[in-house]
Amino acid sequence: MSDLIIVGVTGAPVSTRVVDWAIARAVERRQPIALHSIVGGVLGAVGEDAVLVHALEATRALVETHAQRVRAAGVEVSVHVEAGNPIAVLTKASESAGLLVIGSDYRGPGSGKARGAHGIRIAAAATCPVVVVPDVDTGERHGVVVGVDGSEVSEQAVRFAAAEADRLGEPLIAVSVWTPLQAPRNDLAVYPELYLTNMQAATEEIQALALAGIAVDHPDLEVVRRVVRGYPSHVLNEVAADARLMVVGTHGRGAIARFLLGSISQEVLAHLATVTAVVR
């Protein structure tokens, strides 16, 4: 896997936090950074050329200010500014990257339904792990949360989260969520106690197996285990509200909790509680 960290830069305030996050990781792991900024909305309208030239120049100047901060930290950096579709360009760029870092309000400021839509689509399409950074100060928070469901992609998420927790000197908080089967006529949500007990036990076993190899690679890592009944995205965001980082998989095939981008992972990104990595 490439060591290159690609960073999506926009004019949104969150871009400063995005670049700062990437710098911190690059310094510790001696990784190069490529700053990418894409001017979208090109339609080929009459008179558009002059507007596009100005937009590209202004964007290049903006990105260069961030590049100066990267250089000041002693990190190798390259700058890439172009016109195009941000989702397509960053997705293509991810093919040569080890990590892609973007801001949560990639489409700009606001709080409507479109907020974060580009980030969700990029996380779904990128070929490398994607880190989505919210415009929130997480400096006083602690812990790295990871969603665990026993699937293959969940194993990748656990490995990524454990490495980050070790790097940051933070505890790894493993969260597994189970949800009782939904029956149309079970409106009162009444379930046999034996069933609930067995669901809890089965999920605990799945989590234990998923975490079994952590101590070998990270012998000094503190691991906190949480197995909770509930809805996965709600539980994950609740736990992550106090964490420095959360890690989820792009999809899952486990019977306990499926982290499907477009469902659970999408909901996590749409209501971002902290810096969140989506791993495939």
Across the structure, where does each feature detected by a protein language model lie?
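Structural beta-alpha unit
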Residues: M1, V14, A50-V53, E57, ...
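A short acidic, glycine-rich active-site loop
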Residues: V51-A61, P192-E205
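Glycine-rich, Arg-bearing micro-motifs that act as flexible, cationic patches
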Residues: I102-R121, R141, L245-A270
